[in-house]
Amino acid sequence: MLKISVWHGDLSDSYLKKVTQLGVDCLDFGGGGYFPGVKEQGYPDLDALLKIKKKLSSYGLEINRVTLPDLTEKFIQGRKGGDKELANSCQALRVFGEAGLPIARQRFAGDTFPQQMRRYASSHRGGYRSRGETLARPQAAIPSPEELEKWWERFALAYSQLVPIAEESGVKLAIHPSDTPNVETPLGGLGYHRVIDAFPSRSVGYLYCCGTRAEAGGSSLVLDELHNYGRKGRILMVHLRNVRGSLATAGAFEEVLLDDGDLNPFKILLELKRVGFSGCINPDHIPAIEGDGPLVEQGLAYSVGYLKALLAALATL
C-alpha cells in the first residue's frame, strides 16, 4: 500500500493536527542533528526519541525515515574527528533500530558541486515561488578523478560499517541522489547505481528523488530508473516533486507544483505500482503559495491533496 509522508515541521500540536487532517500517514526527519542528544553526545537519545514517536502515534502518525548524524569534510578528508563522526553515525543507527524505525539516510559531504550552480527564486502561475538553479558561468572546477575515487573510498568505508548494523537492527539504509545532479557528482548517475553493486545487502536501497533525477535527464530517465531499481526491490521511499527543464536540455531547472511541470506524476505512481513498491511518497520541496509562511502549509495541503487524488485514481485500476 502506498502511503504519504511529509516533513516533520515543528512537531507542534497545530502542525500535527493539520497533517493528520490532510490524511498524511508518516513523517520524515531530514536533518542529521534534529533529535535530542545529537548535539550533546553525537547521537540521538533513545528515551527522547521514543517520546517523539509516542507523541506522533497519538495522532495516528508513524516515523517513516530519519537521518543519521552528518559525515562532514572531516570524515571525507580523513581528518581528525572524522572517525568519531562515523562512530556516532553507527551508534545512531543502533538507537534508531532500538526505537523500531524503518529507514535511515546517511548524508555525506562532497556529494554535490554547488560551485557549479547559481540559485534563484523562480516565479510561476499566479506568482507562486520556488527554487530555480542554472549553470554558473564560467563553470567552476570540479574534483579530479582521483579525488572522486577517494570520495568513493570514504563512502565505502562508512557503508562497510553501517550496513552490518543495519542488518542487525532491522533498519534500511537509504541513499539520496546528488542534488543538484551535475556531471561527475558522486551520486549523480552511474555512481548512484554503484551503491547497490558494491553493497548488495537487502538492507541497502534508495531514497529515490524524482525531482532530482528529472533535473539530470527528464521524465524518461525517471521512469527508466524507477523500473530498474523498483524491479530489484531497491526503492525504499520516494520524493515526488515536479520540475521544468533539466541540466541536460536547458542547463537549468525550476521546481514547480505537482501539476505544473514536465513530469506526469500519475505515470510515476503507475510505474511504482507495476514494480510492487509499497512505501511512502513525500511531496518533498513545497513551493510557496500566496500567504504561506515558513512551513508552507498551504502549498503542503495542495500537494498532499493532489497526491491523495492520484492514489485514489490509481486504486481503481
Region spans (language model):
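Histidine-acidic metal/acid-base catalytic patches
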Residues: 1-5, 16-23, 54-57, 74-78, ...
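Active-site-proximal beta-alpha loop/turn segments in soluble metabolic enzymes
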Residues: 134-150, 173-184, 289-291
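Structural motif corresponding to the early beta-alpha repeats
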Residues: 31-156, 168, 212, 273
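Short, flexible loop/turn elements at secondary-structure junctions
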Residues: 8-10, 33, 110, 177-181, ...
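N-terminal basic, low-complexity leaders that serve as flexible interaction/assembly modules and, when applicable
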Residues: 1-45
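Short, internal active-site loops enriched in acidic
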Residues: 71, 109-113, 178-182, 287-288
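Residues at the starts of beta-strands that form the adenosine-phosphate
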Residues: 3, 62, 172
